[in-house]
Amino acid sequence: MAKKLDSIVELAAQKTREISANSGNYMAFLTTAAHNFKYDFRDQLLIYAQKPDATACAQIDFWNKHGRYVNRGTRGIALLVDTDRGYKLRYVFDMSDTNSRQGRTIPIWKMEPRYEDTVIEALENSYGEFPDRSGLAACLLETAKVIVEDNFGDYYTELRGVKAGSLLEELDDLSTETWFKGLVESSVAFIMLTRCGIDPMDYFSGEDFAHVYDFDTPETLSILGGAVSDIAEMPLREIATTVLSLYRTEQRENRTFDENSDRQYHDGRTKQERSV
């Protein structure tokens, strides 16, 4: 067990170095993070390291509770848990590695065109009216701008305290703030676009994330990753709640329609039989 724990600690360190090495690696990580936005940065990093295409991870008791079982032979995704005695491991499994004997599925929210207006309205209620309402993508980009402006300050203060020894050390405070804020905003927007089914490469290129190279120590990258993960989660949870509410309303209406149709059919049959 200790050997496994050590290997996961080293894996986290290795992936930390990899995603800060270039913008391509970093964007690949952001794609995984988008589908696992409820996890913190370290968990996202380890999910990316072990199963980069994971889209819905949970512990085995969650899957069992919802009538699903983990496929035999599946290796869990090991995550680190802080304790008073150091780290311990816990394991999560992606939904793609589970099945249900009863054919039960768990709804994973998906953005659909018919939901967009309601989602935009929900975001405006939280983050203010958008100057550009031309589409969902424009509203997500504006949301990222507003929410980062409101929340990046505390993370920046932490970053100033640990930037010594990194490439950021060569920058003055204004440049550090500008680079950090811009990178967080682009990263949050990238995650939101990705999770909402919009190709982020229509709005970003590798150059937008080039400064990740300067976050070349575990401390600086941890603050960057923590800021991005924490800030992106807020609007995405709101979007998820809105979309799932709309989806469940549709399901109820469909069931009601089906029940009424069945009732009308049954009543019609009864009348016909009586007339015969």
Task: Name what the model sees in each region.
Residues 1-276:
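N-terminal accessory/interface modules of nucleic-acid-binding and processing proteins
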